[in-house]
Amino acid sequence: MSSQIRQNYSTEVEAAVNRLVNMHLRASYTYLSLGFYFDRDDVALEGVGHFFRELAEEKREGAERLLKMQNQRGGRALFLDVQKPSQDEWGKTLDAMEAALLLEKNLNQGLLDLHALGSARADPHLCDFLENHFLDEEVKLIKKMGDHLTNLRRLSGPQAELGEYLFERLTLKHD
């Protein structure tokens, strides 16, 4: 059934928003997996786990923000299957941060593609929404993860486990 409030909101944009919601939920699911992996007793990097669990919450909130916008515009939320994380064992913090950076770059590309579609469909409300609520945050997060990767690589010498521990204690610990 068509919405009575729908105006200048193309079905292509509506479908792209639903796909982006799914991408955010998948990212949240992946970060939840990462967060609890690093919180395990045999990994015991609580600060790293906390970092990823916070990201899980942020991505879930992003999905909700997109869904609210979808309803405000007269679109319909279509929930797709959320794919499970690509792995259950994440290895070292460096490997996990590399996977997270790739995930964020994919999310950012999804946001950029949606923004381009909004521009092509003359939807200034969508473009403004993405600019105000997503694009800047995403770039800042990618930069932060890049910085973390640089520091993790610096510390991954012959005693990589010690470097990983120091990174967690000095960079991510919130005690």
Swiss-Prot record:
One of its GO terms (cellular component) is autolysosome. It comes from the Eukaryota. The keyword Membrane does not apply. Fe cation binds at residues 54, 57-58, 61, 64. The modification N-acetylserine is found at residue 2. GO terms for biological process: intracellular iron ion homeostasis; iron ion transport. It holds the Pfam family Ferritin. It is found in: Cytoplasmic vesicle, Autophagosome; Cytoplasm; Autolysosome. Residues 7-156 form the Ferritin-like diiron domain. One of its GO terms (molecular function) is ferric iron binding. Keywords: Acetylation, Cytoplasm, Cytoplasmic vesicle, Iron, Iron storage, Lysosome, Metal-binding. InterPro entries: Ferritin, Ferritin-like, Ferritin-like_diiron, Ferritin-like_SF, Ferritin_CS, Ferritin_DPS_dom. Stores iron in a soluble, non-toxic, readily available form. Important for iron homeostasis. Iron is taken up in the ferrous form and deposited as ferric hydroxides after oxidation. Also plays a role in delivery of iron to cells. Mediates iron uptake in capsule cells of the developing kidney. Delivery to lysosomes by the cargo receptor NCOA4 for autophagic degradation and release or iron. Oligomer of 24 subunits. There are two types of subunits: L (light) chain and H (heavy) chain. The major chain can be light or heavy, depending on the species and tissue type. The functional molecule forms a roughly spherical shell with a diameter of 12 nm and contains a central cavity into which the insoluble mineral iron core is deposited. Interacts with NCOA4. Belongs to the ferritin family. This is Ferritin light chain. It comes from Felis catus. The gene is FTL.
